[in-house]
């Protein structure tokens, strides 16, 4: 997890025009979170789930911030919505540990990302919710949020 230790995932940025600051996830952190969720969603769509609980040691992040799983196996035998829910619960814990390892204080998580983690940890996820998980607003890069906001205001 050297990437997480060398690159802060939770950053403090100024509010333009004021002396105030707020906490947000770096764009690479949101990309990592979305990539890991997309991997799970892809495997679940194929009717497969993780055969063992996901751990921090199962996540590999390259020097450029690309993320993937390592030393994990997926199985179709016994696939159920409960297995899908378990995979996302474990992903939620792994994402929190990644942020902590990068020096981030969980108390400073932005509200949208906190809600995303709550969504992952809920025990009532349905298969249709996977679309909402991988496209959650907390996983959008800041430039996409600005574009949406500006186009909404001016058009």
Which residues are covered by each model-predicted region?
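Conserved structural core of kinase catalytic domains
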Residues: 1-31
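Short amphipathic alpha-helical interface segments
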Residues: 23-27, 46, 108-112
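Well-ordered, non-membrane alpha-helical segments in soluble/globular domains
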Residues: 26-37, 87-93
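Catalytic-loop of the protein kinase fold
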Residues: 31-62, 66-71
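C-lobe/activation-segment region of protein kinase-like
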Residues: 50, 62-132, 147, 151-155
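Phosphate/adenylate-binding glycine loop and adjacent helical scaffold
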Residues: 137
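Extended catalytic cores and adjacent scaffolds of nucleotide/polyanion-binding enzymes
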Residues: 144
């Amino acid at each position: 997890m050297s990437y997480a230790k060398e690159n802060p995932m939770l950053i403090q940025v100024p509010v333009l025009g004021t002396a105030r600051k707020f906490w947000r996830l770096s764009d690479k952190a949101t990309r990592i979170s979305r990539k890991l969720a997309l991997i799970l969603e892809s495997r679940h769509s194929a009717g497969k789930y993780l055969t063992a609980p996901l751990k921090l040691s199962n996540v590999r992040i390259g020097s450029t911030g690309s993320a993937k799983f390592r030393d994990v196996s997926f199985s179709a035998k016994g696939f159920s919505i409960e297995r899908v829910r378990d995979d996302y619960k474990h992903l939620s814990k792994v994402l929190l540990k990644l942020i902590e390892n990068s020096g981030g204080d969980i108390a400073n998580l932005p509200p949208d990302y906190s809600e995303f983690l709550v969504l992952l940890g809920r025990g009532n996820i349905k298969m249709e919710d996977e679309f909402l998980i991988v496209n959650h607003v907390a996983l959008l890069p800041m430039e996409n949020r600005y574009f949406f906001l500006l186009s909404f205001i001016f058009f």
